[in-house]
Amino acid sequence: MTDPLYVFDGHNDLPWAMRELCGYELDQADLLAGEPRLQTDLPRLRQGRVGAQFWSVYVPCRLVGDSAVTATLEQIDFVKRLVARYDDRLSLATTAADVDLAVESGRVASLLGMEGGHSIGGSLGTLRMMYELGVRYMTLTHNENVPWADSATDEPILGGLSDFGRGVVREMNRLGMFVDLSHVSPDVMRDALETTVAPVVFSHSCAKALCDSDRNVPDDVLADMARGGGVCMVTFVPMFVHQGVADWYAECLDVTEGRGGDRRRFSDVDPVLAERMQTHPPPACTVDDVADHAEHVREVAGVDHVGLGGDYDGATFFPERMGDVSSYPLLLDTLRGRGWSDTELTRLAHGNVLRAMREVELVSRTRAAG
């Protein structure tokens, strides 16, 4: 029987975490019984009522060109092997109808999302082949600019999208792939919204009005996104949720840079985070802080345009009592306590992103027919 309040989450970094932990060797991590070294495993997905998951096939920005493409293919290969290993628990999905079928069968619909335009190596042909392999969203940038789009966390070069970047958006519309605007600069957000003819997603972002982080979404963009049918999937990462943690994280980035590191790269920043967690810990972040963002997006964009994108296994720490993928019911219960109806919670949990996915598919079919 389908869980009426199952979660369709927009972003989970288990593939890269498995690469780092054990070189993708499924026998070296116990995802079936429970894997305490990770924030994601099969028992906790079930506890968290996760019925559909966009698995991020992220690769670091230090990989460019063919190296980025190869690493992305390895990430895709891992997800497909993961699903094949646990095919009684997981099911590959490339359409909204596939998601429905997986959920009805009691399996987690498993979708692929690329995180950063560097994964296509500047090639529309590569973008098309990634679609053929099952990728259904691409985040236009990660933490660094690509030649055709500015990142939110890099020095702006283009002031938005280049002509090629607009062509990428149009090709994604034609293919039936979500344009994901997490990580991009506000100018890229606005250019993409001006260009797209299909709904966009923010796969893991929060509201800039509540937490002034470069990674978050301004209110005017939230409103424009909603007019086009898009969905902002609220993330749980404390430095994007809580202003005090965002300020603490900015200090960590300054320390990283002061030591000669690159503030855009996790490999340089993470050791500083680990050190300062011990010596100068961040303020507490709670489920109520996350709920505030869900409510703000609902207020600005509307209840039909908010979703969830936890970013588990993609961040070093999470709000109190929200440390892994079993935590979604806590957030849903918190929002219910604030007066959200079951209908509104269902839209937040999965209904909105499924509706947007169907609209993206319809745009693709319409353009193909034309």
Name each model-derived stretch.
Residues 7-14, 184, 202-206:
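Histidine-centered catalytic micro-motifs
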Residues 159-172:
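Active-site glycine-rich loop that binds ribose-phosphate moieties when present
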Residues 17-18, 172-192, 304-315:
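Extended hydrophobic secondary-structure segments
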Residues 97, 123-127, 187-198:
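Distinct, well-ordered alpha-helical segments
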Residues 170-181, 188, 219-227, 296:
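Substrate-binding cleft of carbohydrate-active enzyme catalytic domains
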Residues 186, 194-229:
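Acidic, glycine-rich loop-and-beta core segments that form the ion-binding/anion-interacting portion
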Residues 1-161, 212-370:
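N-terminal hydrophobic targeting/anchoring segments and the immediately downstream early-domain regions
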